[in-house]
Amino acid sequence: SEGGGMTRHSLEYSTAYAPAYRVIHENIAPFLGVFAAIDTLLANKNDNYVPVVTIDGRCGSGKSTLADLLFSVYRCGVVHTDDFFLPTSLRTKERLSTPGKNIHYERFNSEISESAATMRPGDTIKYGVFDCQCGTITSSREVATKPFLLIEGSYSSSPDITIKRDLSIFLTISNEEQLRRIAERNKDKYADFINKWIPMEEEYFQEYNIKE
């Protein structure tokens, strides 16, 4: 307009369509569908029920970033599957050659799945945190179960994990961008990702149709 002010819709247009706009952060925009699904889940749940949401996907695809974003908005309890890294005593050739077994799912079920089966809003779940550097559980973490429990990380959709899921999210990434991110943040373990962890993840995705 000549005065430099903001252009407005005409009265006729506003009356007919009632337009409304929101400005959101660019980090949130790619996940609007996720927020909509979670909001719908929360709106339709029983007052005494705690929904479980999982985020699985390729390494480097942004699982932890999305989990942090969801926590900042909902203040939900977050459990990381990295805290259930497989201890050395269980890393047998047979187990590691079986898709989806590269996680201590037995401990996950004992500490998380069983508690989640009876949890109510406001309850807390306490579990041990595995330290990969020390090769053992060195600390514990307590997470809230309100308004929902979020399970973040590779293998969170594994059928060996018996927790009841209400919403499952899968994140993907191009091979080129995946390698770039790994080289940037895990340079010292780049070879392990290429030769071990990525192939194991891909076998797991294919074996159980996780992307579906």
Whereabouts are the PLM-identified features?
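Small-molecule kinase domains that catalyze NTP-dependent phosphoryl transfer to phosphate-bearing small molecules
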Residues: 1, 7-9, 158, 163, ...
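Charged, amphipathic alpha-helical linker segments immediately N-terminal to NTP-binding catalytic cores
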Residues: 1-33
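Short hydrophobic/aromatic beta-strand immediately N-terminal to the Walker A/P-loop
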Residues: 52-54
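P-loop (Walker A) phosphate-binding loop of NTP-binding proteins
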Residues: 58
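Conserved lysine of the Walker
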Residues: 63
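Hydrophobic positions on the alpha1 helix immediately C-terminal to the Walker A/P-loop
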Residues: 66
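Conserved nucleotide-sensing/catalytic segment adjacent to the nucleotide-binding pocket
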Residues: 77-80, 86-142, 148
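ATP-dependent NMP and nucleoside kinases share a basic, alpha-helical "lid"
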Residues: 136-185
